[in-house]
Amino acid sequence: HIFGRFGITAFALSGLDIALWDIAGKAAGVPLHRLIGGARRTRIPCYASFLRYTEPRLVAQYCERALGEGYTAIKLHEIDDAAVQAARHAVPAQVPLTVDVNCEWRLREAIEVASRWRSHALLWLEEPVFPPEDFRALRAVGEASGIPLAAGENLCFATQFEAMLDAGAVQ
């Protein structure tokens, strides 16, 4: 599913769009953020985002390391209950924990797993279902599990984002 079901063409076009904005900023002699309206913030919060390690011991170890380095939130890419549980045990309850499963499951399995993960107090669960543009399924997972959902990295067009929001698929 690496590029959703709309293909690599839309992603290639986004690269061209970025290049054109960069050229416009250089031609105007200003940083791009100024060209499109200026900075609204001088600082933004960030989180430590991990690879999928699978092994609970490693997940806990990386969580502890990230907290020691000053990160104030953690994003996992785990799909296994034990790995997510290990992270939650390593991360204090007041530290936001999120999980991006990269469209791992069909609806039924997504609901089952997300419901089990409710006890981990996730800040959000990201893209739990395939296909990524099945917005009804996304909404169903959120409603059944009570976990806020995040999605959109596989969407290409404003109309897709509009449909996702209209469907109530993400919170």
Give the location of each predicted region:
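Short amphipathic alpha-helical segments
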Residues: 88, 138-139
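Short glycine-/small-residue-rich flexible loop motifs, especially phosphate/cofactor-binding loops
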Residues: 22, 63, 139, 161-162
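N-terminal capping/lid subdomain adjacent to the active-site entrance of alpha/beta enzymes
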Residues: 1-98, 102-111, 115-119, 144
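Oxyanion-binding "anion nests"
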Residues: 142, 149, 165
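Catalytic cores of alpha/beta
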Residues: 107-117, 156-169
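Catalytic beta/alpha-barrel core
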Residues: 72-79, 98-103, 121-132, 148-156, ...
